[in-house]
Amino acid sequence: MPPTADHGDKLSGKVALITGAANGIGRAIAERFANEGASVVIADLDNQTSQSVVTHIRENGGRADAIVCDVSQARDAERAVEHAVTSFGCLTTVVGSAAVFSPVVPIDELSEADWQRAIDVNLTGCFLISKYAIPHLKTSRGTITLIASQMAQVANAGQSAYCATKGALVQLAKGMALDYADAGIRVNTLSPGGIATDRLAKRFGNLEQAQRIWGPKHPLGRLGEPDEIARGAVFLASDDSTFMTGADLLIDGGYTAW
């Protein structure tokens, strides 16, 4: 697919496995990667929506496939990696985007089950998908990008579990960056601010309410758009960032600058 105003070639020849890519930021990353020439595998529990994303990408000239995946389960993570390699011949890029919010309550009101679910999906999910991808990424000298959050840097009341998992992701990426630098694998995190997604709309009631309440907390005065995060993910997966590993790319509208 030749470069156009909507399509580029920054990721031409790349094969990307993206978790949590049926909706929100993950979907935007999958679509932007495909627009930049990557072959994309969507790994998500929501198979129906995943297939609609695949159809959309293919209808726009891209290459995509999907697999049902619970990232908190080792066998699912392993199968997702195998599926990507079988479908497209190799694996060069992993993006860990699957995540869950926890109930907004202080720790003494948070159930152990909700705490464990946050750990299992947000943190263990990225560990597992990375673990099984790394043997293939050693061959391709590829990249891993874990989607963290501005909440890895600053905290919000009632969100201790979410903040803890996202902060841990940043440290996980730094550790892996050191472990695999000699193998040519680059590992970074990307930390969004408040982004206008369906998940955020559900949390606030609707996007207008989210924008009214949370938008002003960002110095730029608004929520970000999913594609603004996706463009950052393209940068981290591309040859534009070849001297970048163990870093956290903040795209947060200035949220952490207050």
Question: How should each PLM-predicted stretch be described?
Answer:
Residues 135, 178-182, 242:
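Alpha-helical segment proximal to the catalytic Tyr-Lys
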Residues 130, 165, 173:
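Active-site helix of classical SDR
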Residues 88, 127-130, 136, 222-251, ...:
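C-terminal substrate-recognition "lid" of short-chain dehydrogenase/reductases
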Residues 3, 182, 194-218, 228:
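A glycine/serine/threonine-rich, flexible loop-to-helix segment
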Residues 149:
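Residue(s) in the substrate-gating loop at a strand-loop-helix junction
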Residues 1-8, 12, 101-104, 154, ...:
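Short C-terminal tail/terminal secondary-structure segment
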Residues 105-107, 111-119, 210, 214:
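Substrate-binding pocket helix/loop in short-chain dehydrogenase/reductase
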